[in-house]
């Protein structure tokens, strides 16, 4: 049996650093990375988003999941106030859409040449942004955002069935694997607390 690759995830500070760097680069990069994290998407899923998948009036996005052919309708995050502006999907998407040029393909995220952003291009731009933001190379891939989202949801008490739906897992078994990661985070936090106390 093949050994499973170690799951990598970003801390809250690392996610913030990546989003700040993405925002500094472009509205497209900020929107694509934020949506990837918020909805626990794979690179191919975010690159496959079309303008018709967005319902800005009702603040929703339809996501076609790659594995299991699931379709989920999810709310777009809207946060009032500057302290949460990096996570305000509605505001970030409006900014991006205002400057986006139409290519006729209908894809939401476009390359600098105006065609659909490919998975390879998205992975490359995420890696560049993550490395510039100080993220370790082994964490500098878009799938770490999906791992991070699952881990953060579970660590904050969201039940497994809700996490499964939010990130588009077909099987609850795919979601359960994140419990161990959350336990690992808790153990590390306990060690840090003990080090400060003793």
Where are these regions (language model features)?
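Short, basic (Lys/Arg/His-rich) helix/loop patches that form interaction surfaces
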Residues: 22-25, 124-165
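Short, charged phosphate-coordinating catalytic segments
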Residues: 36-58
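Short, polar N-cap/turn motifs at the start of nucleic acid-interacting alpha helices
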Residues: 53-56, 139, 158-179
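Catalytic-site neighborhood detector that most strongly recognizes the C-terminal catalytic loop/helix
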Residues: 65-68, 167, 172-192
